Amino acid sequence: MAKTLAQGRKPGSGRKPGKGKTLREGRKPGSGRRRRQDTGGKETDGSQQDQESRLISSRDMEAVDALRELTHSPSSHSAHNSSAAPPPHAAAASTSLPPSLDYTHQSFMDQQQQQQQQQQQQLLQQQRVDVVPPKPFITHKILLSSTGNSGGHVNSNYNADHSINHNSNHNLNSNVNVNMNFTINGSNQDPSSSFLMGPYNYLQRPFIVKPYLDLSTSTAASNQPRTQPSPAAHITKNSDSTEKNATI
């Protein structure tokens, strides 16, 4: 409770109507004074209570009797029976709804659309022919012909002792078939050139080979006439292995 003047309130320090803070001044939203929507106030509430507590008058009773005579008279019964409404299911059957409101019609149309779509998909699947090329674009023969050896096989064999074995077959065709089994390590490779077993790449870039060669099978091949030098002839000259390189 606020203090009164007798209790020690200062004069002029009371609440001043219409001097509340605005939202900009720091008033919280919803903290303002709430006004009633109805302007009547207590007077309207009192009038409603008077209408509810008022007794039924004679005029009200006369109006009720007149309504009873109109609704329950025998003439109205006969007229009502003659023009009796049809049963609800018959009325519903007679009055047809438009297609936009008839749910059975919509469901039937949806089923028809689904069936048509399924038929179209089946026709498309029957008409579609999967075109598969008979052969791949790059065949084994093309790869062999690009390396310059017709019917030759170049196999790289990685052995544990890192030795290089040159085994020659004695099949004399238009080209000499040579099976080269070799391994290339970091010690055998020229650091200035990157050795790649691609088409014509190993013919253009020579590589350094260790002096140790297995000549057990290549001695018989030295007596055979050769029409074309093998790709392994591109070996740099060493003082210790010149004679061995001549037999390859």
UniProtKB/Swiss-Prot annotation:
Signal sequence residues: none
One GO CC annotation: cytosol
Basic and acidic residues bias (residue ranges): 37-71
Segments of skewed composition (Basic residues): 12-21
Entry's Gene Ontology BP terms: negative regulation of transcription by RNA polymerase II
One function term, GO molecular function aspect: minor groove of adenine-thymine-rich DNA binding
Mapped Sequence repeat ranges: 8-12, 14-18, 26-30
Keywords: DNA-binding, Repeat
Bias (Low complexity) ranges: 72-100, 111-127
Region (Disordered): 1-127, 219-248
Quaternary assembly: Binds as a dimer or higher oligomer.
Function of the molecule: DNA-binding protein that recognizes oligo(A).oligo(T) tracts (A.T DNA). Can bind to any 11 bp sequence in which 10 bases conform to an uninterrupted oligo(A).oligo(T) tract.
Misc remark: Present with 4700 molecules/cell in log phase SD medium.
Protein name per Swiss-Prot or TrEMBL: Oligo(A)/oligo(T)-binding protein
Native source species: Saccharomyces cerevisiae (strain ATCC 204508 / S288c)
